[in-house]
Amino acid sequence: MNIPYVDLAEQHAPIKEKLLEAVSKVLDHGKFVSGEEVAEFERRFAKLCGVQYAVALNSGTDALILALKALGVGSGDEVITVSNSFVSSTSCIVCAGAKPIFVDVGEDYLMDPALIEKAITPRTKAILPVHWTGRPCDMAAIMAIAKKHKLAVIEDCAQAVCAEYRGQ
């Protein structure tokens, strides 16, 4: 017996015609990266997130790399994260030229804020918590630690888009 993990055909059946129409439109005008659909997505996603701007990139990996580089993270720096995530949460740190420092997770499988301060060194530049399975990390505790030590925080939300934390 074969039981599919996720039946994507069934899941998308109700909107199949709309999906085909949208894909056909993009294929016809050929603007895969900078077309009006991307601009519309950015506008709507920014509104959904309650921010002024959103920038669509080719991957979450590149988004994290750009965020780290924009903050000046590079060679000789350390970034605290967790190891129980997709490879991007670590590879982005390496691609930025820094060293990932792992802290363990709590019973909720999310970054354990109680372990962060023990991992901080003079080379620590940022904390990269990974929100996972639709659940956000304890951001109040993480932000308090970051503020105390003057560290940047880059949140990997790829697995928890639109997740709420304390009503936000």
Regions found by a protein language model. Give the residues of each.
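N-terminal "arm"/small-domain region of PLP-dependent enzymes with the aminotransferase-like
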Residues: 1-31, 36
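Generic alpha-helical secondary structure signal
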Residues: 14, 18-22, 36, 40, ...
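Alpha-helical structural signal
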Residues: 16, 23, 61-64, 83, ...
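Active-site His/Glu-centered metal-binding helix of metallohydrolases
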Residues: 45, 157-158
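PLP-dependent aminotransferase-like
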Residues: 69-157, 164
